[in-house]
Amino acid sequence: MLSRPLRVWCILLSLAVTGGGRSSAAEPVAAPRTAPLALTPAEYNNTIADLLGFPRDGDRWPARPAIADTLSPPRAASKGVFVPPPPPPVWPWRFPAEPGSDGFEGIAQGQNPSSYQVEELHHAAMHFASFALVSPTFFSCATWATLPATQQETCAWMSLERFAERAYRRPLRAQERERLEAFWHANIAAGPRDQAVALTVAGILQAPAFHFRVEPGDASAGDTTAGLSKWELATRLSYFLWDSMPDETLFAAADSGQLATTEGLERHARRMLEDPKARPAIVHFHHQWLGTDKVLLVAPARRAFGPLFGISPRLDNARDDDLKWPAIMGPVRHSMQLETELFVEQTIFDGAGTFNALLTDNHGYMSDATAPIYGAHATRIPARPTVTRTIEIVVASIGRRQSLTLYPAEFPRNERAGVLTLPSVLALGAYAVQPGPILRGKRVLERLACMDMGAPIQGAEAALPPDTLTAESTNRQRTAAATSPAACTACHKLINPPGFAFEHYDAIGRWRAQDNGQPVDASGSLTLRGGEEITFTDGIDFARKLATSNRVRDCYVLHWTRYALGNQLEETAPGLEALQERFRENDSIKELLVSIARSDLFRMRPTGNPGDNR
């Protein structure tokens, strides 16, 4: 049985979905219809920052207004054993992660509401509402706090009306305006004006029209497809390329009808890709594609890698707490994450900008924390600027913040080639001591070739070779032996070869020529779905061949199209093949995103109820 807050939420959503339709000519191609998309945690926080006119950096927000404590108690910091850690920043709000679909958030089929999520949305709304009082963009008058009471109320209402339209990403409907005004007057009657403003903002931030992207489209009677309305197109485009709401320019373009043509959509898509907000949004997609959004959870063992970072492999006394290894691994993990982000951003926005470069470029970033992983052959590039970020690490349950500087670098061409040889990707495909060819191979097949390998058979994990430093053979030989039974071969003849391609990299992503005293064998061959065969000598050769594979490029297009629509499209979805053929000929990633924005799949949707066209 649904909890009370969840039942209320569902009722409100049903009211929002039944808005009036409009009319337009039908188009032949549209993606299957889904339930309304909820804002993801990243989209919610970005939208809040843009709505209130604050930067996407909690350290640069103002302090919580004094009135905030009357609406919402401050979030408690996690408690340390010895010294309390600093309190969490006022932004972003930390929501529970979405279940996701195929590794991606923001996909309708992977969004499952919960009572806990609804409660967190309420807490977040109450927390952020008071910031409207100190927002540089909220009030439509310059000096609201010093105005006479009547003028304050007039200005506040005008500001709330404008705020609601921006929050809902469309003009208010007459009934919405009436309800909002009644809510505002009830709050004014109940308490001080600043509190009334904050409570009304909190109500707006809890409305389904804010939290959900409802897309009824412009449907004529009898049409099987409907063009999205101008406001829906603006919203879909902004969350596709920015992970946030439209800016004033895009709102104006929607209002004037500029988005009604593919040329208008293309013009604004190109403008938006040049905006700084596109960079973190595109990086965010690639974190989900590669799984590197989980890199802060990797746990290489001290007994295997302690000496690499200048400490003994074991504690001097078994009763001692290990304080050194967490202090080392905290910056290493964060550096891995930032190196991934900077590589993707620089390659797409400041480099070649192609899928080929994404999988083959041997430039990137490193820090003092990860320098031991890259080794002596990595060359820093002093002509390019360094990047310094603040990170948070936890040692002995004590949180602390420190700076981390990353340096542009060039790596040997026989050791690094694109995202698949980043330490973040390699460490995620490993155990505490040994690399995991099965983990790495499965990731390549599923994320790069769109080949779902399913779950392992019962007891498969128990048959894996032990994750130990002492072994009589190479990691490849042990894995091959463990997966040789007849019950395993059907899957592992596909999974093992792409995993073995990266045997030159240990569990932390360091390149190695030998494994257990024997030369590494990273060669192999693989037949992708559709019959495309790839033969390779090592991970570098494999990455270069994947970069030009039609199957792999088609898969990348499929991931991006699903992400843009928030819909787990089938591989055979109408309209998809044209996008894939174009990307085979021109692998510019920006051009792919523009092509998706221009497509019927992006601009249209079926009429009828969700599921009718699936």
Could you tell me what each predicted segment is?
Residues 2, 19-614:
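Low-complexity, glycine/serine/threonine/alanine-rich intrinsically disordered linker
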Residues 1-7:
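Positively charged n-region of N-terminal signal peptides that target proteins for export
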Residues 8-18:
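Bacterial N-terminal signal peptides
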